[in-house]
Design a protein with these regions (language model features):
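Nucleotide-cofactor and metal-assisted catalytic machinery
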Residues: 1-49, 131-153, 224-472
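Alpha-helical transmembrane segments of integral membrane proteins
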Residues: 45-50, 78-105, 109, 129-254
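Hydrophobic alpha-helical transmembrane segments of multi-pass inner-membrane transport and secretion
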Residues: 53-88, 167, 198-224, 467-502, ...
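Residue-level signature of transmembrane alpha-helical entry/exit and packing/kink sites
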Residues: 57-58, 102, 107, 149, ...
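Intracellular coupling helices
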Residues: 73-118, 178-190, 487-528
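Conserved G/P- and acidic residue-centered "switch" motifs that form tight phosphate/ATP-binding loops
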Residues: 74, 97, 110, 122, ...
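Small-residue-rich transmembrane alpha-helices
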Residues: 76, 112-184, 225-226, 523-574
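C-terminal transmembrane helical bundles of large multi-pass transporters
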Residues: 440, 444-537, 548-552
Length: 574
């Protein structure tokens, strides 16, 4: 059961969770021991709605912000270079009586026009590509289909343009309008050596954007390493050749559990009669269904029948399954037996546990024959009946691909919840049997309908889609940022060479070799690049823990990533 509530003023999610646990304990005492296996959990609605999309959205937002800052730093450096060539013009304006504010206003307005033109082009590109991007976005973001480039989006774009103009244009305009530029009237050569302060400013901007590029590339590298680890992950089942669907039926017509079980059996038998079908089973919640599922507490034999005992044990992922479900999903039996016709509503309550759960509850012991009480245990006189472990199966990724859980399976005829998802293993193309499956269901119950048809391979691909999308976006942003950094370094070196033309000529006249001159000019950009790399690596190391929750199978301080990114940028800088 799911309930939605609004927190009172001054209350926190933690306080609500504590109060909800107290209510659950009181209900347990009021109803004897029949609620022992029930658990109440509290989750912020935003976290529940965003689910797997949250890390992807955070990664994209962070990459977008970093790319904007890098672009601003690059543009500011280019404006400083451009402004250096206008020193004489600005000095003449001052000599003719122009005030500093007037010059700043003119230079800033030029930058504002450039930013607005870029903003219009960006909005136009977004408008043209918006539908294609939204339709192909694999992330399950709530209300994504209602997204549009409306007045709010245009206002946000305008604010970004104005903010960018301030960040990019204000400092260069103020810098070049200083009264000290009057000295430019005395410059007879455009190749005069630049002032040390202007050179330092340009170097700081280039080093700063290079540091931001390091952080962005580090994030992209960690995401790629995480995705690689996910691709190597053993999901615990074989998705190839498996068709999944839901069965909708009239609860008025199938108003008892016995009638519903009979319908499930008939549908599975109809599927098995198809020549292409290898195995067919059903389960309460199919693997990789996301955060939605059924959680349960557990008490094992030897522990007191109280909620305090359950709190010491892990929360389990509860499933109801038909006997052939494990064969249909190719979930391997490791020990004991699978469910069969013996496991009925009137027989001894039995369960199958995942391997990790068996090790957790009974370390270094044989779990077969052990007894527990979890959700679905029958109740006799308000006292739950022990459920006996008859089998141990391989762990399967039951909810999210990133998060392993402790799996508990009940026979579908002993479970309080009806199976919902049908899994059919086919020797050929799974979708090829859909018409025959629908015809078989219609022959059993004309009012029943087959919904949610998909292959398990598509389900697995959708589970990886958010990761794949994040990597593509962050990597694209990182590549653009790397291009910006390369342009910034090249501009710095070229401008430094232009400004030192007279010095270079003197050195050449005194016998300096070409390689000496090249080394002299290149050193200007090399030391700036090394400083930016050092700051970027240090910043990435400080911020590494902020992305830990978005990673899988890789440490936030991964040595390979922290070594490869500076090496790559060092090569680009050279």
């Amino acid at each position: 059961m799911y309930a939605i509530g609004r927190l009172a003023a001054g209350e926190t999610v933690e306080n609500a969770a504590e109060q909800l646990s107290t209510i659950a304990r009181n209900e347990e005492l009021k109803n004897g021991m029949s609620n022992t296996s029930m658990v109440a959990t509290t989750t912020p609605l935003m976290t529940h709605l965003l689910g797997a999309a949250r890390p992807a959205l955070l990664a994209i937002a962070g990459a977008s912000g970093a790319l904007l800052l890098i672009a601003c730093a690059n543009a500011a450096a280019l404006l400083l270079v451009h402004g250096a060539g206008r020193r004489r013009e600005i000095a003449v304006r001052f000599a003719l009586g122009a005030r500093r504010l007037q010059v700043v206003r003119q230079l800033f307005c030029e930058t504002m026009v450039l930013c607005l033109i870029a903003g219009v082009l960006g909005v136009g590109l977004a408008y043209v590509s918006f539908d294609a991007i939204v339709s192909r976005a694999p992330i399950a973001v709530p209300r994504l289909d209602q997204a549009a480039i409306d007045v709010r989006a245009l206002l946000f774009a305008l604010v970004v343009c104005l903010g960018t103009a301030v960040m990019v244009g204000l400092f260069p305009a103020w810098r070049h309008s200083g009264a000290a530029l009057l000295a430019g009237l005395h410059d007879r050569s455009r190749s005069a050596t630049p002032t040390s302060s202007s050179a330092r400013t340009r170097k700081l901007l280039v080093a700063g954007q290079l540091a931001a590029v390091v952080v962005l590339l580090m994030a992209a590298g960690l995401f790629i390493r995480s995705f690689t680890a996910l691709l190597r992950l053993d999901l615990g089942f074989d998705s190839r050749g498996v068709l999944t669907f839901n069965l909708g039926f009239s609860e008025d017509r199938h108003d008892t559990k016995e009638k519903q079980w009979a319908l499930v059996d008939a549908v599975l038998d109809s599927a098995r009669r198809l020549p292409e079908v290898v195995a067919a089973g059903a389960v309460y919640q199919r693997p990789l269904a996301g955060t939605i599922g059924w959680d349960t507490n557990v008490i094992i034999e030897g522990q007191p029948l109280a909620s305090e005992s359950a709190s010491r044990n892990p929360i389990l992922n509860w499933e109801a399954a038909t006997p052939d479900y494990f064969r249909a999903m190719d979930i391997r039996l490791l020990h004991g037996r699978l469910f069969d016709e013996r496991d009925t509503a009137k027989s001894l309550p039995v369960v199958i546990v995942g391997q990790s759960l068996a090790v957790r509850l009974w370390p270094r012991q044989d779990p077969l024959g052990r007894r527990m009480i979890a959700y679905g245990a029958p109740v006799a006189g308000n006292i739950p009946v022990w459920q006996t472990v008859v089998g141990v199966v391989e762990d399967a990724r039951s909810r999210e691909v990133e998060a392993p859980r402790f799996d508990l399976y009940l026979p579908y005829r002993q479970a309080p919840n009806q199976v919902q998802h049908f899994m059919v293993r086919v020797s050929g193309d799974p979708l090829a049997v859909v018409p025959a499956l629908k015809a078989g269901v219609a022959a059993i119950d004309p009012e029943a309908r087959v919904d949610g048809i998909s292959t398990m391979e598509d389900v697995v691909n959708r589970a990886f889609a958010a990761w794949r999308f994040s990597i593509i976006v962050v990597s694209a942003f990182a590549a653009i940022a790397l291009t910006f950094a390369a342009v910034g370094i090249a501009t710095l070196v070229a401008f430094a060479a232009t400004q030192r033309t007279r010095e270079i000529g003197v050195r050449a006249a005194l016998g300096a070799q070409r390689r000496d001159v090249v080394a002299l000019v290149a050193s200007e950009g090399t030391w700036t690049a090394l400083a930016g790399l050092a700051v970027g690596v240090l910043t990435a190391w400080i911020l590494r823990m902020s992305v830990e929750s978005m990673l899988f199978g890789v440490a936030p301080g991964d040595a390979l990533t922290f070594a490869a990114v500076p090496l790559l940028l060092g090569i680009v800088s050279v």
